[in-house]
Regions:
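Sec-dependent signal peptide recognition
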Residues: 2-10
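Hydrophobic h-region of N-terminal signal peptides that target proteins for export
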Residues: 10-18
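Pepsin/retropepsin-fold aspartyl endopeptidases
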Residues: 19-297
Length: 297
């Protein structure tokens, strides 16, 4: 019996700036600064398989999930105490928050370094990520979203475990079917058999999820699935689809995908399990905050 893991730290935010106030400076133990090589490293969590980096928030090392399904970068509220200086709380009284969180978000501004990306004064959403943290093999401090990932080049070759910032030299790139949202997320127009299904490209999800009626291959059986988001975790029996292919780009099929099959209204997600044999590449777009996603045939 398999366990299916699911992270959904998606938050849509409008009207970021609304005034600031100086944050208190909590005391914190000195921590060793990671080397440049460690800051460039992309790894996989031993339990969930999600992608992790060490980022610097206000010059403080933080372990963060790389999540193409998140519009904004999120910091766990318990990790704020690690920050010693050089950050400010943002007045959120006039900010409209939209998304799946049931919490009342806070925000702070701080220098952020994620891989080769540097944002001198980045707005980070502050939430309790206890549910997300409970599903990870190591303690994480937050989530890196498309607000900074959208301006960075990266390659995720899960089959070869080649995860790095940049793109392979001389590679032939095929654009993913679909469109980018206003928050920089990729909505893939995937071909599941004879049906075209819009799916969120979500590296913050370890498992692919579809509506039951959209999976022509049918149901393989029931599995015990543990899923969670920024609010809570749930566990129970869910339907698993029979393995089949999903076409996501011209001449590129994701092989033997076995998604969770759910009722209408549930998120429709293209997760890391579907990318296990694929090479996903993101390139920035000149003059835009967000780039484009490609596959290698």
């Amino acid at each position: 019996m398999k366990n299916a893991l699911r992270m959904l730290p998606v938050l849509l935010i409008g009207g970021l700036a609304a005034g600031e106030e100086q944050a208190p400076k909590p005391t914190a133990a000195e921590v060793a600064m990671p080397s440049e090589a460690e800051l460039m490293k992309i790894e996989r969590d031993a339990h969930s398989g999600l992608l992790l980096i060490t980022a610097l928030v206000a010059d403080t090392p933080m372990r963060m999930i790389l999540d193409t399904g998140a519009t904004h970068t999120i910091l766990h509220e318990g990790s704020v105490a690690k920050l010693k200086k050089n950050y400010f709380w943002i007045d959120t009284s006039h900010i409209i928050f939209e998304g799946n969180t049931q919490q009342k978000p806070k925000m702070l501004a701080a220098p952020l370094m994620a891989g080769p990306g540097i944002s001198p004064r980045h707005a980070l959403v502050v939430l309790n990520l206890g549910a997300v943290r409970s599903m990870m093999g190591e303690e994480i401090d937050g989530i890196i979203g498309m607000d900074i990932l959208g301006s960075l080049p990266f390659t995720f070759n899960l089959k070869q475990n080649e995860l790095y910032w940049g793109t392979p030299e001389g590679a032939v790139l095929t654009p993913l079917y679909g469109t980018m949202t206003r928050g920089g997320r990729m909505m893939v127009k995937a071909k599941c058999g004879s049906k075209e299904v819009e799916m969120l490209l979500d590296t913050g999800s370890a498992i692919t999820r579809l509506k039951k009626g959209d999976w022509e291959a049918g149901v393989a059986g029931e599995i015990m699935a543990k899923m969670g988001n920024v609010n809570h975790t749930t566990q129970g029996k869910m339907l698993e689809g029979k393995p089949a292919d999903i076409e996501v780009a011209e001449g590129v099929k994701l092989r033997n995908v076995a998604p969770l099959l759910e009722e209408p209204g549930a998120p429709v997600l293209l997760g890391l399990d579907a990318l296990k044999e694929a090479v996903l590449i993101h390139l920035p777009t000149e003059g835009s905050d967000y780039g484009k996603f490609f596959m290698m045939p």
